[in-house]
A protein has these predicted regions:
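Short beta-edge strand/loop motif at the mouth of beta-sheet-based domains
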Residues: 47-56
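A short gly/proline-enriched turn/hairpin at secondary-structure junctions
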Residues: 37-48
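A beta-strand edge to alpha-helix "cap/lid" segment located at domain peripheries
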Residues: 2-5, 55-124
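Short, low-complexity N-terminal intrinsically disordered segments enriched in polar/charged residues
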Residues: 1-28, 32, 124
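Alpha-helix boundary/capping residues
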Residues: 22, 34-37, 60, 119
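Glycine-centered loop/turn positions within well-structured domains
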Residues: 28, 36, 113
Length: 124
């Protein structure tokens, strides 16, 4: 039996493009993955449309040198849920190591229309 495909193989193009752009610190490529009227909710703060998303990405993604390491992927209808370990230059005091967050991507017509980012609590 062959080895299973890596989680990246399961990703729709806009999700794969977003993660690649984050890891490459490529702001233009990151913003290009979003539809014009998209929304990002990052830890309960909302950013709408390309200008809002661009400002958020510059500050929170590029400015913090964020790096995403995928741990798991679940597809649910038009949504892709990615559990990932995050690293970067952000203040890590009080955060678990590794920092695990869940990205909830909604896509339409080859663009991200909604992204919700949460640090979920363990059920243990």
């Amino acid at each position: 039996m062959s080895d299973p495909e890596p989680p990246e193989a399961e990703l729709p193009q806009p999700v794969a493009g977003f993660i690649a752009a984050v890891n490459a610190a490529d702001l233009d490529a990151l913003v290009a993955t979003f539809a014009a009227r998209a929304m990002v909710n990052d830890q309960l703060c909302e950013y709408w449309d390309k200008p809002g998303i661009t400002a958020w990405a510059q500050r929170e993604i590029i400015g913090q040198r964020l790096c995403i390491r995928i741990r798991g992927v679940v597809r649910n209808h038009e949504q892709t849920v990615v559990e990932a370990a995050l690293d970067g230059s952000f203040d890590k005091r009080g955060l678990p190591d590794p920092l695990i967050v869940t990205f909830y991507f909604s896509t339409r017509h080859d663009h991200l229309v909604q992204l919700v980012i949460l640090r979920n609590e363990s059920h243990d």
